[in-house]
Amino acid sequence: MLFAMQLASASVLPMVLKSAIELDLLEIIASQDTCMSPTEIASHLPTTNPHAPTMIDRILRLLSSYSIVTCSVRSVDDQRVYSPAPVCKYLTKNQDGVSIAALCVAAQDKVLMECWYHMKDAVLDGGIPFNKAYGMPIFDYFAKDLGSNKVFNKGMSDFSSMIIKKILETYKGFQGLTSLVDVGGGTGATLTKILSKYPTIRGINFDLPHVIQDAPEYPGIEHVGGDMFVSVPKGDAIFMKWICHDWNEEQCLKLLKNCYDALPNNGKVIVAEYILPVVPDSSLASKLSVTADVMIVTQNSGGKERTEKEFEALAKAAGFQGFQVFCNAFTIYIIEFSKNISN
């Protein structure tokens, strides 16, 4: 019964966490060497609301029950005080100035949340929840709503930076490349990380024109706007992170064949994606991948996370001879599709 009751209010935690992030509560707490009371935290906010400390206390009390912050009672004044829990390492800015916080805000943004109200109708009547909500595909919408586009890109960019940093600790497949194309590379955050470790690589950041218009200039990186279903820039290797999962088999095959044509004989596509378990379990890794899969249902026609066998079938159908799964970073796997088996 208690679990069912918790499920009934499951939306509360992510929305409260979003508010805490937007108020900078976690950053404020993490910036201090000692525990902080709600009143002390409120003093760092641009507010004259006399009820702010009480509201902050209630927000943080909830977050403490999920081990996002720690809570204790200070003996000198009998007030609850708060400090960062271990997970705050990933919810507050790291030495690179990024965290998962932007992704939390993006995932709970009004634009994406509206999709869920159309999922039932999509199951019964067909169609895509996002399209039902806004009358157009998600990426067409973001081309028009630049504010939401920036929120989405910030979430993806920060998360990408953290994922690729972890990948670079173990994956060695970028060694020896002279050029690398990041297809769907957003504003270039991922490619920047790769080139910071392999500065001799010439980077091409390839995405839709409205995406790269906000991309900052980076040394060694050329931003190219275009449509990956028409053609892909040429390079020694092509990197794609969370791209295949947006599209159905037919669309993925078209994209992968364009990649195949853009590669030299010894070229390869390097894919970073979740790999779905054939049968899910209750582990965090399994939950993350199946959650991502259902999120995609609300946004894209035919998009989905895939099992290892499904990825291999796609690679072979597109003409790639080699297929190998390498390391994973926070459940994001690196998979290579080699144009020739000798690669």
Curated annotation (Swiss-Prot):
PROSITE patterns: SAM_OMT_II. The active site is at residues 245, 273, 305. S-adenosyl-L-homocysteine binds at residues 184, 207, 227-228, 240-241. It catalyses: 3',5-dihydroxy-3,4',7-trimethoxyflavone + S-adenosyl-L-methionine = 5-hydroxy-3,7,3',4'-tetramethoxyflavone + S-adenosyl-L-homocysteine + H(+). The record marks 286 as: Required for cosubstrate binding. Homodimer. The keyword S-adenosyl-L-methionine applies. This is Flavonoid 3'-O-methyltransferase FOMT. Inhibited by nickel (NiCl(2) and NiSO(4)) and para-chloromercuribenzoate. It is an enzyme of class 2 (transferase). Keywords: Methyltransferase, S-adenosyl-L-methionine, Transferase. GO terms for molecular function: O-methyltransferase activity; protein dimerization activity; S-adenosylmethionine-dependent methyltransferase activity. Its EC number is 2.1.1.-. Pathway: Flavonoid metabolism. One of its GO terms (biological process) is methylation. It comes from Chrysosplenium americanum. Transmembrane segments: none annotated. It comes from the Eukaryota.
